[in-house]
Amino acid sequence: MKNSVRAAIAAVLWAVLAAQADTGDERILAARDAARSGDRARLAAYAAPAGHVLDPYPEYWWLSAQVARPADIDPAALREFLERNRGAWLAEKLRGEWLRGLGRRGEWGTFAIEYPFLEQPEQDLQCYQFQARLANGDGMALAEARPLWFNLVDTPESCVPVLQTLVREALVSPDEIWARVRRLMEAKRNTHARYAASWLPADQVPAPSDLDKAAANPAGYLDRLPPNFSATRPGRELALIALARLARDDTLGAYVRYQRMDERFSPAERGYALGQIAWQAAQRLMPEAHTWYRAAGDTPMSDEQIAWRARAALRAGDWKGVRSAIEAMPASLREQPDWAYWLGRAQAALGKQDAARRLFEQIGGHPAFYSILADEELGRGFEEGVPEGLLA
């Protein structure tokens, strides 16, 4: 016992002496090695600032090691470092680590104090923040969290309780649960899809193995469907999932199989199937893509699906279709220079010259590809060379 204590004291003394000697780059490198090896005694000795430009790093490594062991956390030391390095990447990173630990342990009081100082919270921390608000009885938290149901594909563990609460409080319908299952299966997030499917009403929950079969061998699954598959919601949904997955590898084969069973689906279900098939066809530059998109009607689509719908309409020379597709995009996508330009072209082709000019004016006047094209539509042309006075 005495020997082990002496050995520990000797190790600490050695680390202190080494830290005093290595006040330059060597100290920083030694601190990095101590952090990697988990040598907390050496790391503590190297953490004190010594006038080096990289001093925040050893201190960060030391505090990060504390955050990993809740019993060792010194909130005052953490806050002092965070305040001293406010706005720096290391401070943001350390605060995020601290908040994750607080969230995992359900220490919502401290979490609520520290979270507002985070400048760019990642998705898992946003979900911990929703958990904190729910724990504190914030009645607006679920309403603000509801968009996660529709937008979240890669689902951090901290978001699962929030999604579960949306289901428990009946803030998402069975149709919306199925829509999430579809989207997760489209993105090949099968595990999360199975989890979401488990939240369906009992009479609609599919067997997890059926979801896997529909995704793993979609052609075989569709070819072996029983005649009465469409009698239940799960039967139709699994067929739709298989069609969407098959369309990725054999788009025409998916459409042929869809035609055999299209009357078994509701109008909304037919729109979904055709939207998936058209999306894959457009990416393969198949001439049928535009026709299939039109047949899909106004079925809800992801941003990527809508963008390919506009491209398919462009390839088909359907300016009305181009306009309707771009106008259906969210503003963040529709206002990007490429889509603003093509919307302007569509408006011009459809006789809406004033609307076209306004769009070209919005994006013109910059040394960028679509800006130059917009200037040409406005009759300005493009002048090469360095602007006068730039080199003065």
Predicted segment positions?
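Extracytoplasmic and endomembrane cell-envelope/extracellular-matrix remodeling and assembly machinery
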Residues: 21-392
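Bacterial N-terminal signal peptides that target proteins for export
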Residues: 1-9
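Hydrophobic h-region of N-terminal signal peptides that target proteins for export
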Residues: 11-21
